[in-house]
UniProtKB/Swiss-Prot annotation:
<feature type="region of interest" description="Homomultimerization">
    <location>
        <begin position="1"/>
        <end position="79"/>
    </location>
</feature>
<feature type="region of interest" description="Chaperone activity">
    <location>
        <begin position="1"/>
        <end position="100"/>
    </location>
</feature>
<keyword id="KW-1090">Inhibition of host innate immune response by virus</keyword>
<keyword id="KW-1035">Host cytoplasm</keyword>
<feature type="region of interest" description="Interaction with host DAXX">
    <location>
        <begin position="372"/>
        <end position="428"/>
    </location>
</feature>
<dbReference type="GO" id="GO:0044220">
    <property type="term" value="C:host cell perinuclear region of cytoplasm"/>
</dbReference>
<comment type="subunit">
    <text>Homotrimer. Homomultimer. Homomultimerizes and binds to viral genomic RNA to form the nucleocapsid. Interacts with host MAP1LC3B; this interaction participates to the protection of Gn from virus-triggered autophagy. Interacts with host SNAP29; this interaction participates to the protection of glycoprotein N from virus-triggered autophagy. Interacts (via N-terminus) with host RPS19; this interaction probably mediates the loading of the 40S ribosomal subunit on viral capped mRNA during N-mediated translation initiation. Interacts with the viral RdRp. Interacts with host SUMO1 (via N-terminus).</text>
</comment>
<keyword id="KW-0694">RNA-binding</keyword>
<keyword id="KW-0543">Viral nucleoprotein</keyword>
<dbReference type="Pfam" id="PF00846">
    <property type="entry name" value="Hanta_nucleocap"/>
</dbReference>
<keyword id="KW-1040">Host Golgi apparatus</keyword>
<feature type="coiled-coil region">
    <location>
        <begin position="4"/>
        <end position="71"/>
    </location>
</feature>
<keyword id="KW-0687">Ribonucleoprotein</keyword>
<dbReference type="GO" id="GO:0004519">
    <property type="term" value="F:endonuclease activity"/>
</dbReference>
<feature type="region of interest" description="Involved in the inhibition of IFN induction">
    <location>
        <begin position="252"/>
        <end position="296"/>
    </location>
</feature>
<keyword id="KW-0540">Nuclease</keyword>
<comment type="similarity">
    <text>Belongs to the hantavirus nucleocapsid protein family.</text>
</comment>
Length: 428
């Protein structure tokens, strides 16, 4: 740790730099007022950034100085024979040792938590871009998502494409698409776009384009999404025409429609219409005037594609279509089922196997319901009864080798290992 004198010298030096930087900022502001060209504007931005950086650094140094002074005061105090810290409220020492001091200075309580994203602002921002850059960014954050997040964690990245530009004084300038790649400790602003929020809004606004380009997240690929959507219209129409176990059977054959899943969905649509939120209605209205490909009922060729890139909640543009939020919940249960199967067949202790299980459904449910709508569990049951068995049979379980071929190869491995060593052969 720096000594008291070093910190004081550092603070003095930064204060001098800050005075100079503020003077340069004033000069830059005057220059922009006189001649507002790109060079002067760029200089002004860099001057502002320099002042902001110096102010942040100076504040940090002053906090360090205060901490150091406080630590020195504590060090000079006689050690309490009970082992208690001077400001601990306990009268007797706890059985737990003292741990880390967590500095919460950087946390801003005015900022909302992740569940309260401003979808209206996020949607308006995304709709201001050309479709090619949105789809390319979606590809990078879904199909190549794991690598993109790993390479850029803790930063705010910018996507750039020739299709996205703005003209300033007749000059074309790139229009960057900003996405924040948070760490577990990051606090996100309501209008800030994270990979999860981006996948949610992009899939919700442009499902037809996602379908046309067949952009599928690996997380959805392994639960057989590609197979599931292949004959989607036949599948959903057959499902809607089927008899619903949650409706009373009609007394006369002419009223058979009254007991179908279609009728249950019509009743559900009436319930959903009563729980609409104004911000999301405004977003849908704005999207309809732009190039978005929205839909009003689940029996639409591209409706299922809002989940192709595994958004972490139901997209707001599809939230008020009966059966769609529940369809997303069905997919999240399939992800949990596949991970449970993978954990069950893996080698390891019960604790290690439990760690491999997932909670996609709980996360999806919590995030979607925080948008102001309660999921109808009966619809999820209907999906599971109709499609669950078929979906599980099309899971990709990472075991494509024929059992007989595996057994033959394993016997050859066992024989060779025993010939050259006395170690136990591993399983293929």
């Amino acid at each position: 740790m720096s000594t008291l004198q070093e910190l004081q010298e550092n603070i003095t030096a930064h204060e001098q730099q800050l005075v100079t930087a503020r003077q340069k900022l004033k000069d830059a502001e005057k220059a922009v007022e006189v001649d507002p060209d790109d060079v002067n504007k760029s200089t002004l931005q860099s001057r502002r950034a320099a002042v902001s950086t110096l102010e942040t650094k100076l504040g940090e140094l002053k906090r360090q100085l205060a901490d150091l002074v406080a630590a020195q005061k504590l060090a000079t105090k006689p050690v309490d024979p009970t082992g208690l810290e001077p400001d601990d409220h306990l009268k007797e020492k706890s059985s737990l040792r003292y741990g880390n001091v967590l500095d919460v200075n950087s946390i801003d309580l005015e900022e909302p938590s992740g569940q309260t994203a401003d979808w209206k602002a996020i949607g308006a921002y995304i709709l201001g871009f050309a479709i090619p850059i949105i789809l390319k960014a979606l590809y990078m954050l879904s199909t190549r998502g794991r690598q993109t997040v790993k390479d850029n964690k803790g930063t705010r990245i910018r996507f750039k494409d020739d299709s996205s530009f703005e003209e300033v004084n007749g000059i074309r300038k790139p229009k960057h698409l900003y996405v924040s790649m948070p760490t577990a400790q990051s606090t996100m602003k309501a209008e800030e776009i994270t990979p999860g929020r981006f996948r949610t809004i992009a899939c919700g606004l442009f499902p037809a384009q996602v379908k046309a380009r067949n952009i599928i997240s690996p997380v959805m690929g392994v639960i057989g999404f590609g197979f599931f959507v292949k004959d989607w219209m036949d599948r959903i129409e057959e499902f809607l025409a089927a008899e619903c176990p949650f409706l009373p059977k009609p007394k006369v054959a002419s009223e058979a429609f009254m007991s179908t899943n279609k009728m249950y969905f019509l009743n559900r649509q009436r319930q959903v219409n009563e729980s609409k939120v104004q911000d999301i209605i405004d977003l849908i209205d704005h999207a309809e005037t732009e190039s978005a490909t929205l839909f009003t009922e689940i029996a639409t060729p591209h409706s299922v594609w809002v989940f192709a890139c595994a958004p972490d909640r139901c997209p707001p543009t599809a939230l008020y279509v009966a059966g769609v939020p529940e369809l997303g919940a069905f997919f999240s249960i399939l992800q949990d089922m596949r991970n449970t199967i993978m954990a069950s067949k893996s080698v390891g202790t019960a604790e290690e196997k439990l760690k491999k299980k997932s909670a996609f459904y709980q996360s999806y449910l919590r995030r979607t319901q925080s948008m102001g709508i309660q999921l109808d569990q009966k619809i999820i049951i209907l999906y599971m009864l109709s499609w669950g068995k078929e979906a599980v049979n099309h899971f990709h379980l990472g075991d494509d080798m024929d059992p007989e071929l595996r057994q033959l190869a394993q016997s050859l491995i066992d024989t060779k290992v025993k010939e050259i060593s006395n170690q136990e052969p591993l399983k293929l």
